[in-house]
Each structure stands twice: as structure tokens, then as C-alpha cells.
Swiss-Prot record:
Residues 1-17 form the signal peptide. GO terms for cellular component: apical plasma membrane; chromaffin granule; extracellular space; lysosome. Its main location: other. GO terms for biological process: antigen processing and presentation of peptide antigen; CD4-positive, alpha-beta T cell lineage commitment; collagen catabolic process; elastin catabolic process; enkephalin processing; protein autoprocessing; symbiont entry into host cell; zymogen activation. Disulfide bonds join C135-C178, C169-C211, C269-C322. Zn(2+) 4 binds at E205, E209. Zn(2+) 3 binds at D184, D227. The active site is at C138, H276, N300. This is Procathepsin L. Keywords: Cell membrane, Cytoplasmic vesicle, Disulfide bond, Hydrolase, Lysosome, Membrane, Metal-binding, Protease, Secreted, Signal, Thiol protease, Zinc, Zymogen. It is found in: Lysosome; Apical cell membrane; Cytoplasmic vesicle, Secretory vesicle, Chromaffin granule; Secreted, Extracellular space. One of its GO terms (molecular function) is cysteine-type endopeptidase activity.
Amino acid sequence: MNPTFILAALCLGIASATLTFNHSLEAQWTKWKAMHNRLYGMNEEGWRRAVWEKNMKMIELHNQEYSQGKHSFTMAMNTFGDMTSEEFRQVMNGFQNRKPRKGKVFQEPLFYEAPRSVDWREKGYVTPVKNQGQCGSCWAFSATGALEGQMFRKTGKLVSLSEQNLVDCSGPQGNEGCNGGLMDYAFQYVADNGGLDSEESYPYEATEESCKYNPEYSVANDTGFVDIPKQEKALMKAVATVGPISVAIDAGHESFMFYKEGIYFEPDCSSEDMDHGVLVVGYGFESTESDNSKYWLVKNSWGEEWGMGGYIKMAKDRRNHCGIASAASYPTV
């Protein structure tokens, strides 16, 4: 954690004796701490309780507005409840929005009409939701998700791949472990390395360690990657014809942090400043096929408690909302 945040926590903790709390939330606070294994020092407890109550109030207000038809999604308290939005962005969002390596460019199939909805989970392309923990390794989970899908397409076998292998070993390609990275750099590592180990043989630790790649346990490979033009129409055709696609999004908002269900639309979302790598596993629409009811089906890496069992429906065909089409790619196998 950034020393600035630690200092802020200590300073506010010293003043915690003057903080006032909503005592009607006491039982919920105690239950939340137990559920998420939170143990605080004497000076930190008051500060974290204040942050948690602020987040709880924001969530309740949002959901009241949702019931009035002002929002298209709900929010819920989760494991991030005692974190400020600044801490959250620093710890959880590790996509580095910088100029990537150049891959091949996706060629949209001529005269192809994409189906109205796609869900690659139903075809066996997608492993269960994973959890990156407090490590900025979202890029690794996005990359393994896309490669898992392409290996299933090639072999008919779905094998969970090692994010830890990427976190520990893809530094020479430009990735920085828990401090962030790019999916294209991960795909390049697999090609350069000649393989990637299974998750079973090289389990996730949520911290960067020395590289322990063992070719005996390699279960996947790629020959490079394909970048998709920065348009939702191109992304839609890629998802429909290729499989799950790695994308980057702007996830640095409290609304995303506490998303629960519904179609996510955040007015302040950027289509250029992306900070989080995720996996598009399909798309669809709710009720009528109007623009406001279309969504991308996105797999996150924050565990099953977050969102819709670890997934989020993100607004589709609304001017590249949150930059979902700005940095899309997939590995070639």
C-alpha cells in the first residue's frame, strides 16, 4: 500500500475518537468484518469504520435512485467496503494504458451478420471466476481467460491457466507483476517462452515472486496476438466469431467498485483512460433490443461475491462506453 494512504489512515485514526458513527449499523459492521476477515489496529478501526459507513450510505442512495428509475444497475456492499476509491484504484486496477506492441489487425468477416446474442460460457470456453486479490494483476487474468478460450477452441479441453506464471515471468516483455501490465505483453511472453503452465501446477499467490515456469507442465501456447479495431461493431464480430476477448476498461469509479447487477452505465466513464483488464465472454440485450438495453457480458477477476457471480453487464453500443473497444485483443493459437 502507498505510504501516503498509510499515513492518512494513521492521521485519521488518531482523530477517530472524535468520529461519530451510525450505531444502527453496528451489527452490519461486525458481520461484515467477520465475513471478510478484517482485523484492525486500535488507530485504524475508526478510520475504516468511517470509510465503510460512507460507502454504505452511497450504495443505499444509489439503490434508492435505482428504484426511482434513475439508474440501470444496482450496487451492493462487498469486500472493498473499507477502502477509499483512491486505494481501490491503486491496488486493484493494474492495466497500464500505454502504447502496446503491434499485433496483427483483426479483419472483420465480409458480409457476416453477427447473432443478436452470444455467451461463450454455454459452449464450454470459460473457466470459473477467479480472484486476483490485492495485486494489480488484472491483465494476467484477462490474458489467461482469452488463451483458455482459444485453447479450448483448438483442443476441446478447458484447462485453467497460470496467472502466477505471467505475473512472475513476463517482466522482459514489459509487464510489472502486481504493479500492472498489458494483455498483449502477456500473449507475447507465451509466444516467446514457448508455453504457459497450468494453474494447478503453478498456483496463484497474489504477489510477485521469482519465475518458476516448468515446460513439463506447459498446457498452452500461442503464436502472437491480434488487435481489434477500436469500434464496438468490430469487437462484436470478433466476440461472435473468435471467442472470449481481452479488453481494457475504465473501472476507476465507486459505481463499478460496488456494482451488483443490471446494465452498468457510468456517465463519468472514459473511453480513453482505461485502468482494468477484463474478459468479454459474450453480449446480449434485455427485453427490447433498444440501445439502452444492449450489453457486453464481462468476466471480472474479483471473485464470485462481486457483481453477478463475478460478472458484469456493461452498456453496449453507447459510444464505446468505458473504453471497452479501445484495447481489445486475443491470442493466436
